[in-house]
Amino acid sequence: MINIIFLHGLLGTKNDWQKVIENLPHFNCIALDLPFHGQAKDLEVTNFEDSAEYLAQQIKSAVKNGPYFLVGYSLGGRIALYYALQAQLERSNLQGVILEGANLGLKTDEEKQARFQQDFAWAQRFMQESPEKVLNDWYQQPVFSHLTTEERLQLVEKRKSNCGKNIGKMLLATSLSKQPDFSEKVRLSSLPFFYFCGERDHKFQVLAKENQIDLVTIPCAGHNSHLENSKYFSKKIENCILKIVRP
């Protein structure tokens, strides 16, 4: 049975993948909690290398030397990128990577400096303010603009129990400003990469097209397409994986 490892985004937990996994009965699906999240809430990391080492340990424990695919959403996708293309560690039998709404990296020092200031400000808020207050503002960001008021409130309610100093620390450890620009490495990699993106997620649609990645558009969905259209998302995962294992 083919193994699929799922990585959630900032503020999420492994349970975010439940609906997707239910639609993939013919695969061995393993969703992991990232550091500072869920059952790994007390596990501290300070950078991408630490995060990739944690990921390598979890994968080794889950699949031994068996073949596996990585699926990562947003922050989880960025950690998957670092693990697959940069980390100084053994990746054993990684067969391919599916990214969902994950930024490949910033190109200029100016962009990185601006992003660090932005992430630092958010991190301070996560560390100092009430979860409800900071999450209400977090979900007002342009990437979530397609959400209705009710959907925003549901997300705030869902995320507030996992929200606090831990999220601020993770934001600083894995700020996009600290991530290498992987756009060229993804294009040149012999490892298959696929990019999943909701049709309403215009920012990441543009990013995927600019970087000439193999784009899979998820209809009726925005940034969090695996949550908003789980069934279609699962079907496309299956299609991508079968392309590789049964060419």
Curated annotation (Swiss-Prot):
It is an enzyme of class 4 (lyase). Its EC number is 4.2.99.20. Pathway: Quinol/quinone metabolism; 1,4-dihydroxy-2-naphthoate biosynthesis; 1,4-dihydroxy-2-naphthoate from chorismate: step 3/7; Quinol/quinone metabolism; menaquinone biosynthesis. One of its GO terms (molecular function) is 2-succinyl-6-hydroxy-2,4-cyclohexadiene-1-carboxylate synthase activity. Pfam families: Abhydrolase_1 (PF00561). Residues 4-229 form the AB hydrolase-1 domain. It catalyses: 5-enolpyruvoyl-6-hydroxy-2-succinyl-cyclohex-3-ene-1-carboxylate = (1R,6R)-6-hydroxy-2-succinyl-cyclohexa-2,4-diene-1-carboxylate + pyruvate. Keywords: Lyase, Menaquinone biosynthesis. GO terms for biological process: menaquinone biosynthetic process. InterPro entries: AB_hydrolase_1, AB_hydrolase_fold, SHCHC_synthase_MenH. Monomer. NCBIfam families: menH_SHCHC, PRK11126.1. HAMAP family: MenH. Catalyzes a proton abstraction reaction that results in 2,5-elimination of pyruvate from 2-succinyl-5-enolpyruvyl-6-hydroxy-3-cyclohexene-1-carboxylate (SEPHCHC) and the formation of 2-succinyl-6-hydroxy-2,4-cyclohexadiene-1-carboxylate (SHCHC). Belongs to the AB hydrolase superfamily. MenH family. PANTHER family: 2-SUCCINYL-5-ENOLPYRUVYL-6-HYDROXY-3-CYCLOHEXENE-1-CARBOXYLATE SYNTHASE, PROTEIN PHYLLO, CHLOROPLASTIC. This is Putative 2-succinyl-6-hydroxy-2,4-cyclohexadiene-1-carboxylate synthase. It comes from Haemophilus influenzae (strain ATCC 51907 / DSM 11121 / KW20 / Rd).
